[in-house]
């Protein structure tokens, strides 16, 4: 009789230990649902120094960023985010930020905003799980202050964007309304593992499949879509995955995703650099500031050089 009792006690201890480990890890998990705090409304704290009515941009690039990513923002300002004309079309770049509890970081961003005039900010905690709020803030800004933009791109701070090739493809596409493109995700499912960065509970999203959406690393849409998404977003249940949330809005609007080109141009997984390859892509992920500067310089230095036909 002693052996079964000891075995039962051993099993109970194992179960108890597993439960203790689970809850201790959950309390330390930075991606649990309780880790994000958001406000659905609020005034803009910072607005960029630009007037779209006087000089309507062809392409507005909205870059999600955080207070600690100054090096990333500076590298972007010196490369693909520099305000300039491409094929006679004006491009403008703006950075999307929330707020931080650090007084020093707040002051630094205030000074940066005064110097560059390219920061859009609202009063919500700047954490990963508020990326939907950050993205919708940018879309709201286009809706309210820059509806004249022909196209909008939402992207991230660790991206290489070939704005020259993107502009060329958009001009060839000749689409001005209800257009949305990027790295298409057409058959994605919610991740239910609590320790995943992309965990979504049944209470947050009860369905078993996501609608078609584009990877949040970089997607492009015609200017009219900004106002349509902003208006319909008020009736769409909030989900912390911003690319999925935008996909839900597009589903409500019956806007279908389209390929930008017959060949792949968006690379959310990263790529090995070569001048000829990067001339024919639109977006590449996992690019550090120093690397971005090096890639950009290599592309600038090779202007006029021929590449083998694809």
Swiss-Prot record:
One of its GO terms (molecular function) is N-acetyl-beta-D-glucosaminide beta-(1,3)-galactosyltransferase activity. Residues 1-7 are cytoplasmic. It is found in: Golgi apparatus membrane. It is a single-pass type II membrane protein. Belongs to the glycosyltransferase 31 family. Keywords: Glycoprotein, Glycosyltransferase, Golgi apparatus, Lipid metabolism, Membrane, Signal-anchor, Transferase, Transmembrane, Transmembrane helix. Its EC number is 2.4.1.-. GO terms for biological process: lipid metabolic process; oligosaccharide biosynthetic process; protein glycosylation; protein O-linked glycosylation; response to bacterium. Pfam families: Galactosyl_T (PF01762). Glycans are attached at residues 130, 174, 231. Residues 29-310 are lumenal. The chain crosses the membrane at residues 8-28. Catalyzes the transfer of Gal to GlcNAc-based acceptors with a preference for the core3 O-linked glycan GlcNAc(beta1,3)GalNAc structure. Can use glycolipid LC3Cer as an efficient acceptor. It comes from the Eukaryota. Expressed in stomach, jejunum, colon, pancreas, small intestine, testis and gastrointestinal and pancreatic cancer cell lines. Hardly detected in lung, liver, adrenal gland and peripheral blood leukocytes. Gene3D superfamilies: 3.90.550.50. This is Beta-1,3-galactosyltransferase 5. It catalyses: a globoside Gb4Cer (d18:1(4E)) + UDP-alpha-D-galactose = a globoside GalGb4Cer (d18:1(4E)) + UDP + H(+). Its main location: Golgi. Pathway: Protein modification; protein glycosylation. GO terms for cellular component: endoplasmic reticulum; Golgi apparatus; Golgi membrane. InterPro entries: Glyco_trans_31. It comes from Homo sapiens (Human).
């Amino acid at each position: 009789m002693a052996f079964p009792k000891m075995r039962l006690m051993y099993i109970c201890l194992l179960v108890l230990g597993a439960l203790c480990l689970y809850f201790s890890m959950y309390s330390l998990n930075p991606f649990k649902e309780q880790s994000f705090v958001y406000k659905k409304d609020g005034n803009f704290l910072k607005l960029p120094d630009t007037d779209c009515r006087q000089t309507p941009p062809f392409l507005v690039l909205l870059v999600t960023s955080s207070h600690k990513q100054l090096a990333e923002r500076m590298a972007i300002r010196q490369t693909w985010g520099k305000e300039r004309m491409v094929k006679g079309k004006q491009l403008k770049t703006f950075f999307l930020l929330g707020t931080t509890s650090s007084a020093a970081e707040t002051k630094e961003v205030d000074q940066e905003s005064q110097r560059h005039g390219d920061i859009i900010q609202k009063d919500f905690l700047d954490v990963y799980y508020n990326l939907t709020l950050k993205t919708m803030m940018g879309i709201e800004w286009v809706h309210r202050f820059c509806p004249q933009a022909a196209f909008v791109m939402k992207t991230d701070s660790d991206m290489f964007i070939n704005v020259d090739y993107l502009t060329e493809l958009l001009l060839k596409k000749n689409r001005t309304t209800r257009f949305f493109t990027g790295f298409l995700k057409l058959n994605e499912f919610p991740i239910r593992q609590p320790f995943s960065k992309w965990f979504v509970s049944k209470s947050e999203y009860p369905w078993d499949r996501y609608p078609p959406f584009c990877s949040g690393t970089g997607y492009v849409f015609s200017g009219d879509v900004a106002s349509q998404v902003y208006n319909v977003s008020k009736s769409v249940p909030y989900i912390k995955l911003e690319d999925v949330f935008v996909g839900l809005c597009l589903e409500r609007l019956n806007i279908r995703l389209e390929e930008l080109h017959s060949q792949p141009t968006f690379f959310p997984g990263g790529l090995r650099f070569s001048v000829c390859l990067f001339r024919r892509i639109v977006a590449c992920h996992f690019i550090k500031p120093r690397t971005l500067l090096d890639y950009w310089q290599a592309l600038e230095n090779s202007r006029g050089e021929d590449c083998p036909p694809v």
